[in-house]
Structure formats: C-alpha cells, structure tokens
C-alpha cells in the first residue's frame, strides 16, 4: 500500500484535464447566460 504511492491512478493526466475541459466552458456558458439575462432586463 505504501510502495504504490506513485502508481495509484493518474489523476493529473486524464481526470484533471477532463474536469477542467468540462468545467471551464460550463462556467463561461453560465456566466454568459446570466450576463445576457441581466442585460435584457
């Protein structure tokens, strides 16, 4: 358990990129939607 410290599962290779690739456009999309709704009012 302690020897497998480096080979658990690659968090910083696939899951980190996937989370950021999905989170950044959704935050930008929600921000643009809220800005458009505030501008229309």
Curated annotation (Swiss-Prot):
It holds the Pfam family Cytochrom_B559. The chain crosses the membrane at residues 16-32. The keyword Transmembrane helix applies. GO terms for biological process: photosynthetic electron transport chain. Its cofactor is heme b. It comes from the Eukaryota. It is a single-pass membrane protein. Heme binds at residue 20. With its partner (PsbE) binds heme. PSII binds additional chlorophylls, carotenoids and specific lipids. GO terms for molecular function: electron transfer activity; heme binding; iron ion binding. One of its GO terms (cellular component) is photosystem II reaction center. It is found in: Plastid, Chloroplast thylakoid membrane. Keywords: Chloroplast, Electron transport, Heme, Iron, Membrane, Metal-binding, Photosynthesis, Photosystem II, Plastid, Thylakoid, Transmembrane, Transmembrane helix, Transport. Belongs to the PsbE/PsbF family. This b-type cytochrome is tightly associated with the reaction center of photosystem II (PSII). PSII is a light-driven water:plastoquinone oxidoreductase that uses light energy to abstract electrons from H(2)O, generating O(2) and a proton gradient subsequently used for ATP formation. It consists of a core antenna complex that captures photons, and an electron transfer chain that converts photonic excitation into a charge separation. Heterodimer of an alpha subunit and a beta subunit. PSII is composed of 1 copy each of membrane proteins PsbA, PsbB, PsbC, PsbD, PsbE, PsbF, PsbH, PsbI, PsbJ, PsbK, PsbL, PsbM, PsbT, PsbY, PsbZ, Psb30/Ycf12, at least 3 peripheral proteins of the oxygen-evolving complex and a large number of cofactors. It forms dimeric complexes. HAMAP family: PSII_PsbF (MF_00643). This is Cytochrome b559 subunit beta.
């Amino acid at each position: 358990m302690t020897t497998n410290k480096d080979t658990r599962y690659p968090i910083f290779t696939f899951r980190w990129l996937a989370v950021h690739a999905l989170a950044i456009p959704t935050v930008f999309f929600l921000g643009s939607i809220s800005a458009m709704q505030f501008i229309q009012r």
